[in-house]
A protein has these predicted regions:
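Beta1/beta-strand and adjacent pyrophosphate-binding region of the FAD-binding site
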Residues: 1-6, 22
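Predominantly flavin-linked oxidoreductase catalytic cores and closely associated redox partners
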Residues: 3, 13, 17, 29, ...
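N-terminal FAD cofactor-binding segment of flavoenzymes
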Residues: 13, 26-74
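Short beta-strand "acidic-cap" motif of Rossmann-like dinucleotide-binding folds
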Residues: 19-25
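Short polybasic amphipathic segments
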Residues: 72-78, 125-128
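Short beta-strand to alpha-helix junction loop
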Residues: 84-105
Length: 174
């Protein structure tokens, strides 16, 4: 459920592994309207942030035409208005083009897409669509983001509210 970056990537890997894959997404086309998140780390930055993740270049495929710009630093502006710069290899994506490219990769690997179809609920191995259609699957992946029906069924709102606190401090730290 969900054909965004996570759903399309899971679909590609599952299809490449020989599984029969159907991605259901309420949007048509996938990626519209824009949801969020256009700044992402480059693959080189991901390798330094997550050194134990194998095959980063295969996992995160971003075609050149989906990259709006690149940067080598990030700036955080503190409440007092003073900025702090730090090294960070990043890319600003054209998210619609990026999502379309990931859908194309998954489809070229054999995944099928059912777009413009809303999931009403999921019961065990059954996915119930809002038009009354019932789909069966041995494995159902919830990649629909915050509004995903599997997320709603298994995780409460309170469990997702993770307080994040941090302190910005200038200087060299190791």
């Amino acid at each position: 459920i969900g054909g965004g970056p996570a759903g399309s990537t899971v679909a590609r890997y599952a299809a490449e592994g020989g599984l029969s894959v159907l991605v259901v997404d309420g949007r048509d086309p996938v990626g519209t309207p824009l949801q969020c998140g256009e700044l992402v780390p480059t693959n080189e930055e991901m390798k330094s942030l997550c050194p134990d993740v194998p095959e980063v270049d295969d996992l995160f495929r971003t075609p050149d035409e989906a990259i709006s710009s690149k940067s080598d630093k990030m700036r955080i502006v503190k409440p007092n208005g003073k900025g702090m710069d730090f090294k960070f290899g990043g890319m600003v994506l054209d998210r619609v083009a990026h999502d379309e490219a990931l859908v194309d990769l998954a489809a070229s690997s054999g995944a099928k897409f059912l777009l413009g179809s809303k999931v009403k609920r999921v019961d065990d191995e059954s996915v119930h669509l809002s038009d009354g259609t019932v789909l069966k699957g041995k494995v159902i992946v919830g990649a629909g983001g915050y509004n995903d029906p599997i997320r709603k069924k298994h995780w409460s709102e309170e469990s997702l509210n993770i307080p994040v606190k941090f302190v910005l401090k200038e200087g060299q730290h190791s």
